[in-house]
Amino acid sequence: PLEALKDRGYWYPSLQYEPTIARWLTEYNKAWGEWLSTSNSWQEAYYQIARTDSRFELDTDRYESPEHWHSWNDFFARRLRTPLVVPHQGMVSPCDGVLMDMPVKTTSVEELSDLLTGSPYKDVFVGGKAIHWVLDVFDYHRFHAPCAGTVIECRTIEGIHAGGGVIIWDAEQHRYRYAQLAATGFQSLETRGVLIMDTLDYGRIALVAVGIQQVSSVVWNEAIQVGTKIEQGQELGLFQFGGSDILMLFETDRELTTENNKPMKVGEKLTINN
């Protein structure tokens, strides 16, 4: 944090939120993202390096053949080898990632309005509940429908390409370190995709796919449009390179039973009490 930038109305007094620098970072990172979709961004050597780390799960039968990867983004957003099959009734995780429980009752109307910028449905989630997945670079970076429903809103909100957190002084390690926050604050600044569904069992739910840091790319499947009837487990979209979060918002009368900081896989069962 910089003292000179305090009291300027920035989300955090850091240069990445200063408008001129934020615009340049956004332009630079978009250009970088375009390059990461070219063949020059990918080499066989990168695949062999990734194979040595079991967290990528490349030596399992989970993912498609690497012959389909012709760019870094092809690899990063790699498909599953077989279509996702959801054997559960009820709600399932829309993605891989670490699950975090977040009470929306501590989030102001203004913050939700920022997160769902311009949505006519934003007020129905105030006082409700939210859950939040943080995706790691090793995770599967496509996201799927957590339940069946009808799309009533689907769009992408362009944001700035900031760091998705703050830099703090770690007195124990005697160095500055990056601290990602689990609140809905910084997500309201990032590029994000907003999908709101009307569901039979859970009322209206919002799925917010947040592209955090650097490229911040959220790509919806072309078939996902307002009025589309979605099946549980259906692929909704993907993240290209950059940090990735998924948030789900529920109406006020829904109760969730979740285990905080729990690693999950896409399609894994969630406990939602009607």
Segments predicted by a language model, with ranges:
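Contiguous, well-folded functional domains in the mature portion of proteins
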Residues: 1-274
